């Protein structure tokens, strides 16, 4: 069924929801998140409180914003579907801090030919001064529009729960998720991109922090004083990273090592890296590369090099394979919406990968958003509406 994409009333509601959400500044901060601040920015509360008010107005039940800025609500099954499985849908409220998400000025293009080759499509894009925020406000809009349908139209549907989370972009989106409120045995994140994407496999993700300790002395007497410059230790380490393991040289199922940020003085330097792979074996190989390079720089310079690894999230494929119902239900929903399934690996992670680790299998579905995290970001209204159709089809499945 295509109850949103073929209904002008609800497509207009979807567009209005999306435009309203992207105008709300809700950028997170990776720097603050790494310091333990949660949520990492105060503006995420503005988005949370807006959604709380809107969920309440829809007639959703048990609407709450937790003390950690998670928005939760549920809605009971219709009388004829009391025995159906409850389903949880999730989307994240924050936008990435790499490109500004403040004062977003969305541009509406009523001819999608140059974007989706569909003249009837409506495209929402940016004025090139900020990102758009389709990641993941397109997901929020798709969920909210589907909820508007089931709370106002007479229809048979299963019980539904929703969670809108903070700090997904910082990698901390599930750190304080209120699992005690969740009744559903499985869930879906609405945080994908291209039309038809259904993602059941993601990276194993680790971070590495490399600390370099040198020896400072007066620069005029550095030779006599035995200066060991941590700036040069850092540079030497970076120069030794294998080019064929960089993000810009990998694709598909290939993993990578990504240097993300660094700081340095003569006496000390710090480098943060991301390690990504679909297999634990390759992750171990990447860790080994880092350790060998650390030892090499230490031996060459006489300074001290230490490495700390931290697990961020794991590939969700194994857990989803153990729970076929969650995938079967969404595949059926795609077919009913006349959308071809494109089951591709996520070269990243979602809140769903963390939730899957916690025992709630959670694949990811598309939103119709493109060119994330950039000033060229854009969304297709027709595809966003299809995502909303699929949410409803999941809820209608007995």
Stretches with model-predicted labels:
Residues 13, 81-159, 164, 184, ...:
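Active-site metal-coordination/substrate-binding segment of hydrolases
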Residues 116-130, 213-217, 337, 369-373:
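Glycine/charged-rich beta-loop-alpha catalytic/anionic-binding loops adjacent to active sites
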Residues 2, 230-398:
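Metal-dependent amide/peptide-bond hydrolase catalytic core
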Residues 124-205, 246-260, 264, 271-278, ...:
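Acidic/histidine-rich catalytic neighborhood of metal-dependent amide-processing enzymes
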Residues 32-84:
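A non-catalytic alpha/beta surface segment that caps or lines the substrate-entry region
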Residues 187-232:
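Phosphate/diphosphate-binding glycine-rich loops and adjacent basic-rich segments that engage nucleotide
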């Amino acid at each position: 069924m295509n109850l949103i994409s073929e209904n002008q009333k609800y497509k207009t509601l979807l567009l209005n929801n999306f435009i309203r959400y992207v105008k709300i500044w809700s950028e997170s901060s990776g720097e603050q998140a790494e310091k333990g601040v949660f949520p990492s920015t105060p503006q995420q509360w503005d988005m949370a409180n807006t959604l709380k008010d809107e969920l309440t107005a829809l007639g959703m039940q048990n609407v709450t914003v937790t003390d950690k800025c998670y928005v939760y609500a549920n809605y009971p099954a219709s009388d004829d579907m009391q025995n159906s499985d409850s389903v949880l849908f999730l989307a994240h409220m924050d936008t990435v801090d790499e490109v500004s998400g403040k004062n977003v000025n969305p541009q509406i293009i009523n001819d999608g030919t140059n974007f989706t080759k569909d003249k009837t499509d409506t495209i929402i894009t940016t004025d090139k001064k900020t990102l758009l925020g389709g990641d993941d406000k397109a997901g929020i809009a798709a969920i909210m529009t589907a909820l508007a349908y089931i709370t106002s139209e007479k229809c048979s549907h299963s019980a539904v729960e929703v969670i809108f989370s903070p700090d997904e972009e910082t990698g901390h989106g599930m750190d304080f998720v209120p699992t005690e409120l969740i009744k559903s045995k499985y869930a879906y994140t609405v945080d994908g991109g291209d039309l038809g994407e259904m993602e059941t496999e993601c990276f194993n993700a680790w971070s590495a922090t490399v600390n370099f300790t040198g020896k400072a002395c007066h620069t005029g007497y550095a030779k006599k004083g035995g200066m060991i410059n941590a700036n040069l230790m850092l540079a030497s380490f970076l120069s030794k990273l294998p080019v064929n393991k960089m993000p810009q040289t990998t694709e598909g199922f290939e993993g990578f090592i990504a240097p993300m940020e660094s700081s340095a003085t003569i006496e000390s330097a710090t480098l943060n890296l991301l390690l990504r792979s679909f297999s634990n074996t390759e992750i171990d190989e990447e860790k080994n590369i880092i350790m060998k390079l650390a030892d090499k720089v230490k031996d060459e310079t006489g300074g001290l090099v230490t490495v700390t690894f931290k697990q961020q999230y794991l590939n969700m494929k194994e857990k989803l394979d153990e729970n076929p119902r969650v995938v079967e239900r969404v595949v059926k929903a795609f077919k009913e919406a006349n959308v071809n399934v494109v089951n591709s690996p996520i070269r990243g992670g979602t809140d769903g990968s963390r939730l899957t680790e916690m025992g709630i299998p959670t694949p990811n579905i598309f939103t119709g958003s493109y060119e994330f995290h950039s000033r060229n970001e854009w969304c297709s209204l027709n595809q966003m509406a299809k995502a909303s159709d699929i949410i409803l089809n999941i809820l209608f499945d007995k």
